[in-house]
Amino acid sequence: MQRAKAVEGSVGTSTVANMMNRDHMRAFFRRTAALVAFVALLWAVHLLNWIIGYGLNPAFGLIPRHVSGLDGVIAMPLLHGSFAHLMANTLPLLVMGGLLVATTTRALLPVNAVMIGLGGGLVWRFGSSAIHIGASGLVFGWFGFLVARGLVDRSPITLGAALVVGVLYGSLLWGVFPGQPGVSWEAHLFRALAGAAAAFLVRTHVHVPRLGGVDLD
């Protein structure tokens, strides 16, 4: 009788674990779909922007210390100056965004809110008097978050993600220094700092789905 109850309890626990794992997988695919949809939105907005002669950039770009430029805090990542500009940001967005959605199952919205709000606010307050556009600030923000989170959490997963972005995109750090014509180094710097701050301010839950019944933690 006791053995039967033990087996029954084990089966019940296994069933619950499998259900939780399926929930995590579904959430992962939803987040991945959202990431792909976001990148597709960037291309759709840019196509429209190109058709109208890039009129969206002065209308919705971030203009430091101008009230009319405050909407750029949110709209800035959606706007680009050319197809080459957007193409240069697309792959890093997919790679770092993929690492983000694969290793962070909670607090994604707060993390991005801190990064976009704080980083964009600092650009608006301290940035140069120009129209700041582009998703590269978002790339730097995710870079800062992934690296800082690895140092904060020190789990194998977060350290692995930090190592991957460090190896693949460590050269990005040159982008936080001034002196590059036409480059919003302020957006790079402040978004990266905001992403790092998000790693300290927002606790995230790390989970890797089980494959074939084996944990990949």
What annotation goes with each model-predicted range?
Residues 2-217:
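A detector for small-residue-rich transmembrane helices and their helix-helix packing motifs
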